Amino acid sequence: MTKSAEAFRTITEVAELLETPTHVLRFWESKFPQIKPVKRAGGRRYYRPADVALLVGIKHLLQ
């Protein structure tokens, strides 16, 4: 079953989508204040579709 386009994604799901390690996503989060995933219990990150789109753009610009 696939998630809705509007569903929140975990850092692992976003990393797989972008083919980018999770530590890189955390680093980008520390350098780009526009990336603001929702943090839930235990500090787990959940990325909104807008966050994912922003990360796609950042990856594209850094390549």
Swiss-Prot record:
InterPro entries: DNA-bd_dom_put_sf, MerR-type_HTH_dom. Residues 10-63 form the HTH merR-type domain. This is Uncharacterized HTH-type transcriptional regulator in himA 3'region. GO terms for biological process: regulation of DNA-templated transcription. Keywords: DNA-binding, Transcription, Transcription regulation. Pfam families: MerR_1. SUPFAM superfamilies: Putative DNA-binding domain. The lineage of its organism: Bacteria, Pseudomonadati, Pseudomonadota, Alphaproteobacteria, Rhodobacterales. GO terms for molecular function: DNA binding.
